[in-house]
């Protein structure tokens, strides 16, 4: 009986994963072969709008998990630049790809997802056309892989990454700006030829249609924190417990809760910090 159960479990596991997309920078799944694609990138840094030195092909499609993007960045291997860096770092010496999406196609807000050739990521938002902030973080997935004459980046941007307006019908119209920074040439290529620093930006995005597979669902994420302090001078101890709760009510509404954020762990609260003895007390010995 146990053997049958194990066999059944692994069979189901295999079938489920057989039809799932692996984010690995290889684009080996059949979905990528039939995906929509375009190559109309223009040089926006320097701001010439010339045909780029290196060709870039972008692909996209959607399924129940989210929207997938891929870049095929043609470039000799000796010109490819790798570097790992902290999350949200902008000034990294590496090739990179950007995906900026306006999910509602109304030019109110654009969400940026960037990965470097080194598999480090950055996410940010654009509002008021090109007002930029990297104080927004989300859960999404990207992977790059280097080949002899090109490198590939592959993205999965889940449907629940941001609030979206409900759309009727089989397709959702989104707008995007896709970009590539080639470090060796110090050039940026963009489709549809938009410069991040020039306004209007959001309202000029490229219009795309993807399958409307986003469904309303409630999701709750809880991130607990714990802090322990030991005051050796006064011989006492203190334990703080708290955390953050993120409640996605539906596509349009989200609520964030912060519980006991007085020990410097909660990212959304950078004002209230627990200055307990172990963190701030530095006894000074004076010699005369």
Where on the chain are the PLM-derived regions?
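Structural preference for beta-rich elements and adjacent junctions enriched in aromatics
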Residues: 19-286
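Sec-dependent N-terminal signal peptides
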Residues: 5-16
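N-terminal secretory signal peptides that target proteins for export/translocation
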Residues: 1-2
């Amino acid at each position: 009986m146990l053997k049958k159960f194990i066999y059944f479990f692994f069979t189901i596991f295999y079938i489920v994963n057989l039809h799932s997309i692996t984010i690995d920078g290889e684009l080996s799944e059949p979905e990528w072969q039939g995906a929509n694609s375009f190559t109309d990138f223009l040089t926006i840094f320097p701001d010439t709008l010339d045909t780029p030195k290196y060709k870039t092909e972008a692909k996209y499609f959607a399924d129940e998990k989210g929207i997938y993007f891929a870049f095929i960045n043609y470039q000799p291997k000796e010109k490819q630049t790798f570097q790992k860096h902290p999350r949200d770092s902008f000034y990294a010496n590496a090739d990179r790809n950007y995906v900026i999406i306006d999910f509602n196609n109304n030019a109110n807000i654009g969400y940026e997802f960037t990965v470097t050739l080194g598999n480090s990521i950055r996410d940010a938002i654009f509002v008021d056309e090109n007002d930029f902030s990297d104080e927004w973080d989300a859960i999404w997935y990207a992977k790059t892989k280097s080949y002899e004459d090109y490198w590939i980046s592959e993205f999965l941007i889940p449907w629940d990454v941001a609030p979206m307006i409900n759309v009727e019908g089989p397709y959702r119209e989104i707008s995007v700006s896709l970009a590539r920074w080639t470090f060796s040439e110090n050039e940026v290529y963009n489709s549809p030829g938009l410069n991040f620093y020039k306004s209007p930006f959001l309202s000029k995005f490229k219009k795309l249609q993807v399958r409307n597979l986003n469904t309303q669902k409630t999701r709750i994420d809880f991130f607990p924190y714990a802090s322990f302090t030991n005051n050796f001078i006064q011989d006492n101890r203190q334990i703080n417990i708290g955390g953050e709760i993120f409640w996605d009510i539906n596509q349009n509404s989200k609520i964030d809760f912060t519980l006991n954020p007085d020990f410097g762990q909660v990212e959304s609260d950078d004002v209230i910090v627990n200055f307990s003895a172990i963190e701030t007390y530095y006894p000074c010995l004076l010699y005369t």
